[in-house]
Amino acid sequence: MKIRGRAIVYGDKIDTDVIIPAKYLVYTDPNILGQHAMEPIDPEFPKKAKGAILVAGRAFGMGSSREQAAIALKGAGVLAVVAESFARIFFRNAINIGLPVLQVPEITKKVKEGEELEVDIENGYCINLATGEKIEGKPIRGLPLAILKAGGLTNYLKSLR
């Protein structure tokens, strides 16, 4: 499962309240949630998110357990999230809604804003196409990979019928 896109880079400890502020949790439409993704730290995020790969530091998605955080990123058009580490609940929520995620140590030191990336979820690496550097991460395998390939948990469960 390979994904290509340009990098949008953020730092450490981006919590779910930043990814989608609580005042927008009344909405269920992914497109509306996407219009407000990352609003507290980057009001321009929705304009640059379509077709992008979000790159972040440590503890991405920490804080409140809200699946709307992953839904908002996907609704904004983010193709994948690559981070040095994830809050476990965000990681699983992303997989369950079909948003590819990959843990890659030190990724923020090796990728700059706007650089093109190729992310291989199944084999666990990123290639910075601007520099040619292959950056190793933790592959997604087994059931989580099957869920991602199906487009999320709902589609995966439907495929079992």
Swiss-Prot record:
<keyword id="KW-0432">Leucine biosynthesis</keyword>
<dbReference type="GO" id="GO:0003861">
    <property type="term" value="F:3-isopropylmalate dehydratase activity"/>
</dbReference>
<dbReference type="InterPro" id="IPR011827">
    <property type="entry name" value="LeuD_type2/HacB/DmdB"/>
</dbReference>
<dbReference type="Pfam" id="PF00694">
    <property type="entry name" value="Aconitase_C"/>
</dbReference>
<comment type="subunit">
    <text>Heterodimer of LeuC and LeuD.</text>
</comment>
<dbReference type="InterPro" id="IPR050075">
    <property type="entry name" value="LeuD"/>
</dbReference>
<keyword id="KW-0456">Lyase</keyword>
<dbReference type="GO" id="GO:0009098">
    <property type="term" value="P:L-leucine biosynthetic process"/>
</dbReference>
<protein>
    <recommendedName>
        <fullName>3-isopropylmalate dehydratase small subunit</fullName>
        <ecNumber>4.2.1.33</ecNumber>
    </recommendedName>
</protein>
<keyword id="KW-0028">Amino-acid biosynthesis</keyword>
<comment type="similarity">
    <text>Belongs to the LeuD family. LeuD type 2 subfamily.</text>
</comment>
<dbReference type="InterPro" id="IPR000573">
    <property type="entry name" value="AconitaseA/IPMdHydase_ssu_swvl"/>
</dbReference>
<dbReference type="InterPro" id="IPR015928">
    <property type="entry name" value="Aconitase/3IPM_dehydase_swvl"/>
</dbReference>
<keyword id="KW-0100">Branched-chain amino acid biosynthesis</keyword>
<dbReference type="InterPro" id="IPR033940">
    <property type="entry name" value="IPMI_Swivel"/>
</dbReference>
<comment type="pathway">
    <text>Amino-acid biosynthesis; L-leucine biosynthesis; L-leucine from 3-methyl-2-oxobutanoate: step 2/4.</text>
</comment>
<comment type="function">
    <text>Catalyzes the isomerization between 2-isopropylmalate and 3-isopropylmalate, via the formation of 2-isopropylmaleate.</text>
</comment>
